[in-house]
Structures are given as C-alpha cells and as structure tokens.
C-alpha cells in the first residue's frame, strides 16, 4: 500500500486563509483574498531573509512595512488583525536595515547608506582623471524592480547619478569634449518572459525599452485654442466632418506605453493567442534613466554649422500624475503612443486636453434645401476647469545621468478572454427532437422534424398561436443586441458617433466592409506603416471581431406584428424602406434592443495598435464595457507620465519684452523602460477536432521582415481565434 500523500503544513492559520498566520508552508495554492496574498508575499520575504542568514522575527523588516501598506484598507478581519499586529511590532522592535537577497518589487526605493562602488568604477575614474576629466559620484540605490507600491497611482523615486566635470562646451555650463560623461544606470530589455505556474496558470512579464527623443517645447505657455471648421459643416450633409472643439495645448509631452505593440512582438502575440484562454492584467512599472541633455548652437559662418554640446546643468522635468488629477488622455486613440520597434528611437506625444465649449449644430439632410445652422456659445463659466501640471503634480528635475522610477502599480480589472463565441440565439439550449433520421449519406435537405408545428411540446411566448418552431421557441436571453449602427448624436459640444461593441453579424467578413462595430485603425511609421516617404497617407486596417454578438445591417429585418397577421409595411423594419415609404434609413439607426436580458462579450485585444487599459468613468451609473480597451481599471489607473525640457534661458531674457522666452535651444535623449505583468490561463482542448490558430504562410511571412533599406511593417494579428461555447 502506498504511503499517504504529505499535506502542506498549515501552521496557525485561521479559517478562510492559507497564508495569514505563522508556521505555514509556501505551497498552499492561490491566496483566498488580497490580505492572504499580502501574507504570502510576506512569508516569501521572510524565507529569503532566513536563507541570507538574517532573523526577521526579532526585527522590524521592510517586508513588515510592506504588509502594513498592503493591508491598510483591508476589510476582512484577518487582514485588520495582521495590520495592527505589525504596526505594534514596528513600535517596539529594532529595525532590520539590510535587505534580503531577493527583495520584493513592491517597496518604495529610498536613499540608503552609500555602499562601496565596484572596482571597475575606480579604474574608469583613474582613466578619466588622467585625461583631465572630473570624478564621478553616484548615489547607490536599488534598480527599478525595487520600485514603490502604487495603490493610488504610485510614489516615484528619483536616483541621481550625475557626472561632474569641467568640460569645454557652451550652453548653460554644459560639458563638451571628453568630460561630462556619466555611468550607465540601467539595462535595455525587450524580452517577454513566460513563467509556468501551478494549475495551468502562466505569468507573463513583458519588458519594454525605448530611446526617447524630446525637443524643448515650442512655447513655455499654456494655450487655449479654438478649432472651428465651419467651412466644412456649412455644406448640407456634412455633419460628420465637424471638427469644432477647444483644447488646452501645454508645453509638456506624454510618455504613453498603453498599446499592445509597445510590449509584445508578433511572435510573442502568436504564442499568447494560440495557447492562452484569458489574460489578467497584474502590474505596471516604468522608469527613465541615462538622461542626456544637449544644447544646439550655430556658427556665424556661411553656411552655418550646428554645434552640439552636453549640458550638465540643464534639466529634464518629469511629473507622474499618480492620483489621476489631470484629464486622462490615452494616446492610442490617436496612434501617438511610444513606437513599436525597440531598435528605433521614438518620441513622446505633445500633451493636450479638451476644454469645455458649447455649440449647436443643426444639420441639413442632403435631400432638403436648407443650410446647416452653426451657433457657437463659447465656454460656460460654470464649467471651467483649467489644469496645469506645475501646480497639480509634483515635478522632479533630472540632470544628465539621473533616473526616475514610478514604482509598481497594481491593476484591479476584470480578465480578458482570448476566445470567441459562436452561439447565437438559434443555437442555445436543446434542439428539437427528430422523429426520423436521414437514411442516405450526404443528404443536405432533411427538412421535416416529423411532428406538426402545432403538436410539438415546449415553451413559447406566443400567446395567440400554438405553433412551436425554431423561431418561436423561448430562449434564455438575447445574444448580442441591435445597436444604433452608424448613428451620430448631438451633444452640447457637437456631434459624435455612437460607440458600439464589436461583433460579427451575418455574412460580413470582408475587411473592406465594416461589420457591426469593428474598429478601423490608421497609423504611421512608428506603429507599423511600411512606407518610407514623408507626408504619405497613413496605413489602415479594419479589425474584424470574431464574436457572434453583432447584427447584419445590410440584411436584417425585425417583425413586430401579431403572429397570424400578414406582414405590412408599417409593422416590419427592413434594411430599406423601414417605415411607410421613407427610404434611405437602416433600421439599426432607430432600433435598440439592449436590455437586462442582453448577453454580450467584451471587446477584443487589438494587436498591435489597440489600447490595453482604460480609466473608469467617474459617474454614478458606469458603463459595463469600454469599446477602446479590454481592461477597465476600477477606481484608479496608472498615473500618466509627463516630461518636458526645462527652460534654459539666456542673459537676454526679459519677461516683459515678449511672450516667447529667450532660450538656449536644448533637447534631451533618455532611455525609457517598463515592465507590464499579466497572468494567463492555459487553454485546454475539449473538442475532438483541431481548431484554427494564428498562423502565417510563405507569402505573408515577408510582411514581418525588413526590406533592403530597412522598411518594414507590423501586420495586425487576431486575438480571439479559438472558439468557445457560451451556453
């Protein structure tokens, strides 16, 4: 007889928990709640301390502080007890200052006592000193992986790694020649790591790094700009060409990594969608390092010669909106995120946001003789909200060689499926019983169930007939819904197209025919366009959703009449002529069946140009889905990261002389890197047949390769090819 299996040691763990309590083992499976997850992380840190020869039980350690921070808002009784226990320990126990060999990734980086630099630093210093350069000094701190917990958006940490030197360059005391070169302060990493866990789970760590180029802003001022293209909307039928709005143009730029192509290459995405069934968004962190600031001057000779010099006293301004104070402006909707090619330098997008502006546009139908009416009301004084970064968000000043880390933000989002559903209402439940079956092979027209339609059993909602058919049998819910398709609505600030969730409807699978709600992306060379000429039309693609939850606008009809009456023109909605002779109206413009019985899938991840996460609306009634991103952050989302080259003034600056400052032309190159962590569930096979997966053939393989001058494109990839049943 085989010996009994050894059970994991539970220790003094209260009911309902697996790790909250002393003496338990670290193999209890998934934690039961956030407090239990914090306890598991705490236990792992203690184990690391013990392995390194330190006793965390007699000292107050960083792991204890981390547990206090993670349970400060705990609602469960165990988390509350643990929180106050370690607060009491903090008050009486001596502090354990040394960190374990593998510290956690969720504690703020703080300046610590300077440690002895490695030997190669002294060798480099000796060489520089011999050449006449200054010495390098460095504040030794932990790398970005030791960033801060970011429950409310993150607490940034700045590390100064600045070189000092005499230099012979011009422009703000900048260093030129052989001086002013700092020590490399980070690593360039674009690998995607897959860690296979228990019970079919996979931890996916996407690393991304980019060289970012940032020019100084055209102006140091905030500007309120009114955009008015009334020449277009003055023509009847052109309401959809309306561009009128007001925006605040700022001197800052936005570093936005919120797009799938920033994090995954095409091969990574193929592996994910072919083997995983769902994605969970876990955490996000980012860092700026190896900051370089340079000035540009021109000689007086003809033709003029530009001279570039390192400026060790110029500053890069960095602000992290960790509390989401500023308007949320995801750049993926304008295809202005960081670029998708790790080996190509990229630029951040100039940051701007909408400002309140009332107007009325009364359109004219193309078949009428009237002209559109445009009335501009201006800004309502009750609605003015002018935001400035300088007085709303802490701003950090970085100089050559400095670093900035945001810390780690942990997401609270619902998971995203990587499978699609094929069942519509006609495929739900138990099919009708067939009294007889086909007797010959290949029969395709077996049309008789064998029981008269008024003699069948079952449930319908037809009160005036006894017929039970596949059309009348009662289904549990409605899969998908009829939406206002291609409809525009008026708002106080102008018309907008109604968003609808993407879904496959009818037979529309041609990418040139927009199916129900399928998004269409236009993008440039940073984000997948192959052409190398300037000023070209952006490349485009339409992402056809696989979910069978849409409608077929070109061929749908809706009948709303008594069952036993003939169909009349005023009681049926057809694709054309839906209401008593009025032509040119699609029924989906005026009919909406969304209700409490509607079943709908989330939007798919759109690789590479789609947005990953979105911010939850601050409204009492919140939308259940957002059509631009599969992950909607509950309560808070990662803080937006803003950068700006600080004003580098000349001695001629006079604040009263001109609206434009007298500045030295200065720009910055810096390295950005980030880490985005997912948890994914491996997809299990439950069917006999193999399924379609993301693949390529010999012909389209070359879409992923550069040509002889380096031009290449990123082809969009499907994310929900694998089918699943929904009922």
From Swiss-Prot:
The keyword Metal-binding applies. Residues 25-35 have a biased composition (Polar residues). Residues 19-64 are annotated as: Phospholipase A2-like. It comes from the Viruses. Residues 166-183 have a biased composition (Gly residues). The keyword Metal-binding applies. GO terms for cellular component: host cell; host cell nucleus; T=1 icosahedral viral capsid. Residues 1-10 have a biased composition (Basic residues). It is found in: Virion; Host nucleus. Disulfide bonds join 633-637. Residues 1-38, 95-184, 507-536 are annotated as: Disordered. A motif (Nuclear localization signal) lies at residues 4-13. Keywords: Capsid protein, Clathrin-mediated endocytosis of virus by host, Cytoplasmic inwards viral transport, Disulfide bond, Host nucleus, Host-virus interaction, Magnesium, Metal-binding, Microtubular inwards viral transport, T=1 icosahedral capsid protein, Viral attachment to host cell, Viral penetration into host cytoplasm, Viral penetration into host nucleus, Viral penetration via permeabilization of host membrane, Virion, Virus endocytosis by host, Virus entry into host cell. GO terms for biological process: clathrin-dependent endocytosis of virus by host cell; microtubule-dependent intracellular transport of viral material towards nucleus; symbiont entry into host cell via permeabilization of host membrane; viral penetration into host nucleus; virion attachment to host cell. It holds the Pfam family Parvo_coat. One of its GO terms (molecular function) is structural molecule activity. Mg(2+) binds at residue 323. InterPro entries: Capsid/spike_ssDNA_virus (IPR016184), Parvovirus_coat (IPR001403), Phospholipase_A2-like (IPR013607), VP1/VP2 (IPR036952). Interacts with host TFRC. The capsids of autonomous parvoviruses expose a proportion of VP2 N-terminus and part of that sequence can be cleaved of to form VP3. The N-terminus of VP1 is sequestered within the mature capsid. It contains a phospholipase A2-like region and putative nuclear localization signals. Capsid protein self-assembles to form an icosahedral capsid with a T=1 symmetry, about 22 nm in diameter, and consisting of 60 copies of two size variants of the capsid proteins, VP1 and VP2, which differ by the presence of an N-terminal extension in the minor protein VP1. The capsid encapsulates the genomic ssDNA. Capsid proteins are responsible for the attachment to host cell receptor TFRC. This attachment induces virion internalization predominantly through clathrin-dependent endocytosis. Belongs to the parvoviridae capsid protein family. This is Capsid protein VP1.
């Amino acid at each position: 007889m085989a010996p009994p299996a050894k059970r994991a040691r539970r220790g003094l763990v209260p009911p309902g928990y697996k790790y909250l309590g002393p003496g338990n083992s670290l193999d209890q499976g998934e934690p039961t709640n956030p407090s239990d997850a914090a306890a598991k992380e705490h236990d792992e840190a203690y184990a690391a301390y013990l392995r390194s020869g330190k006793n965390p039980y007699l000292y107050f350690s960083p792991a204890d502080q981390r547990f206090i921070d993670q349970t400060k808002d705990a609602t469960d009784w165990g988390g509350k007890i643990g929180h106050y226990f370690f607060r009491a320990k903090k008050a009486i126990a001596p502090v354990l200052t040394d960190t374990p060999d593998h510290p956690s990734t969720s504690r703020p980086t703080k300046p610590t006592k300077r440690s002895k630099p490695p030997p190669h630093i002294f060798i480099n210093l000796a060489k520089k000193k011999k050449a006449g350069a200054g010495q390098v000094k460095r504040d030794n701190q932990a790398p970005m992986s030791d960033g801060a917990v970011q429950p409310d958006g993150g607490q940034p940490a700045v590390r100064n790694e600045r070189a000092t030197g005499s230099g012979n360059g011009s422009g703000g005391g900048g260093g030129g020649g052989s001086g002013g070169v700092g020590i490399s302060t980070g690593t360039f990493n674009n690998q995607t790591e897959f860690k296979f866990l228990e019970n079919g789970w996979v931890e996916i760590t996407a690393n991304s790094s980019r060289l970012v180029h940032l020019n100084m802003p055209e102006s140091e001022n905030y500007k309120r700009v009114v955009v008015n293209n009334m020449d277009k909307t003055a023509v009847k039928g052109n309401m959809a060409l309306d561009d009128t709005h007001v925006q605040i143009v700022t001197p800052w730029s936005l570093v936005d990594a919120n797009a799938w192509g920033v994090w995954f290459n095409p091969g990574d995405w193929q592996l994910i969608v072919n083997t995983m069934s769902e994605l969970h968004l876990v955490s996000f962190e980012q860092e700026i390092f190896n900051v370089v600031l340079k000035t540009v001057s021109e000689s007086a000779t003809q033709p003029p010669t530009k001279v570039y010099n390192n400026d060790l006293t110029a500053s890069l301004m960095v602000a992290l909106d960790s509390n989401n104070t500023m308007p949320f402006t995801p750049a993926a909707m304008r295809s202005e995120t960081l670029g998708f090619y790790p080996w190509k330098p990229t630029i951040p997008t100039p940051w701007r946001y909408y400002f309140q502006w009332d107007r009325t546009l009364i359109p004219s139908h193309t078949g009428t003789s009237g002209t559109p009416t445009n009335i501009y009301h201006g800004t309502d004084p009750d609605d003015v909200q002018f935001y400035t970064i300088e007085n709303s968000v802490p701003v950090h000043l970085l100089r050559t060689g400095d670093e900035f880390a945001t810390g780690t933000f942990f997401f609270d989002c619902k998971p995203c499926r990587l499978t699609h559903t094929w069942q519509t209402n006609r495929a739900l439940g138990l099919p009708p019983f067939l009294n007889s079956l086909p007797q010959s092979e290949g029969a395709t027209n077996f049309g008789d169930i064998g029981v008269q339609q008024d003699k069948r059993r079952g449930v319908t909602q037809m009160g005036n007939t006894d017929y039970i058919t596949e059309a009348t049998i009662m289904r549990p819910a409605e899969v998908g819904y009829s939406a206002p398709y291609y409809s525009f609505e008026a708002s106080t600030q102008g018309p907008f197209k109604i968003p609808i969730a993407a879904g496959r409807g009818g037979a529309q699978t041609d990418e040139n025919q927009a199916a129900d709600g399928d998004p269409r992306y236009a993008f440039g060379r940073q984000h997948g366009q192959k052409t190398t000429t300037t000023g070209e039309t952006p490349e485009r693609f339409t992402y056809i959703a696989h979910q069978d939850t849409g409608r077929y606008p070109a061929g749908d009809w809706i009948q709303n009449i008594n069952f036993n009456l003939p169909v009349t023109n005023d009681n049926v909605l057809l694709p054309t002529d839906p209401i008593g002779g009025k032509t040119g109206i699609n029924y989906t413009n005026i009919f909406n069946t969304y209700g409490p019985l509607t079943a709908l899938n989330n939007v798919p991840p759109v690789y590479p140009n789609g947005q990953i996460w979105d911010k939850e609306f601050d409204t009492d009634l919140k939308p259940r889905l957002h059509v631009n991103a599969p992950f909607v952050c509950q309560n808070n989302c990662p803080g937006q990261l803003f950068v700006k080259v600080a004003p580098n003034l000349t001695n001629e600056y006079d604040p009263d002389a001109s609206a434009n400052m007298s500045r030295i032309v200065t720009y910055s190159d810096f390295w950005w890197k980030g880490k985005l962590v997912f948890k994914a569930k491996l997809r299990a096979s439950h069917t006999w047949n193999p399924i379609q997966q993301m693949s390529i053939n010999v012909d389209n393989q070359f879409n992923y390769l550069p040509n002889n001058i380096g031009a290449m494109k990123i082809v969009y990839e499907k994310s929900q090819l694998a089918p699943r049943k929904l009922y």
